[in-house]
């Protein structure tokens, strides 16, 4: 995946174009490489900067992976629970919102999730979940 991506970047640069965002298949490959601990710095950079925020299939893969790391269900050497929560917050809404709301209930991630949600304006009807949670959760 890395070689193909670097080739793609080179071809785009020759035409004075930025590389395209990753698609769902490429994002899954990035996730698999991060899980295996292969070239963490390169793949973490791709996960952080080359997947568009929003609700496309690549964002779905990214949010699912980061949620599993943030909740402690998946181990990734290069991403802590807090950093996974932070990265979810950079997705600007969509698939990350329900995860961030759930992460308010985990001691390790509550403060980071709170900060992330406070900067997200695209939470739509999920604000009701935060309001309900605020009756018993100081971070909500």
Please provide the spans of the model-predicted regions.
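Conserved hydrophobic register position within alpha-solenoid helical repeats
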Residues: 42-43, 80-85, 113-117, 140
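Amphipathic alpha-helical packing elements
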Residues: 2-31, 36
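An N-terminal, globular interaction/scaffold subdomain
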Residues: 39-53, 60-62, 78
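Charged, low-complexity interaction regions
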Residues: 17-21, 38-39, 55, 73-77
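Structural signature of alpha-helical solenoid repeat scaffolds
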Residues: 47-51, 89, 118
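Amphipathic alpha-helical scaffolding segments comprising HEAT/armadillo-like alpha-solenoid repeats
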Residues: 24-31, 53-72, 91-104, 122-134
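Eukaryotic acidic, Ser/Thr-rich intrinsically disordered low-complexity regions
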Residues: 2-5, 115-140
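Alpha-helix N-cap/helix-start positions at coil->helix boundaries
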Residues: 40, 74-78, 94, 106-111, ...
């Amino acid at each position: 995946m890395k070689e193909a991506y670097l080739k793609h970047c080179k071809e785009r640069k020759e035409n004075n174009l930025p590389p395209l965002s990753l698609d769902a298949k490429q994002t899954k490959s990035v996730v698999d490489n991060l899980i295996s601990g292969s070239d963490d710095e390169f793949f973490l950079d791709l996960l952080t900067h080359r997947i568009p925020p929003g609700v496309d299939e690549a964002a779905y893969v990214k949010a699912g992976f980061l949620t599993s790391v943030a909740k402690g269900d998946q181990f990734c050497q290069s991403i802590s629970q807090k950093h996974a929560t932070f990265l979810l917050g950079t997705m600007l809404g969509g698939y990350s919102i329900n995860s961030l709301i759930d992460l308010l209930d985990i001691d390790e991630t509550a403060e980071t999730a709170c900060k992330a949600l406070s900067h997200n304006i695209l939470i739509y009807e999920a604000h009701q979940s935060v309001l309900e949670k605020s009756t018993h959760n100081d971070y909500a």
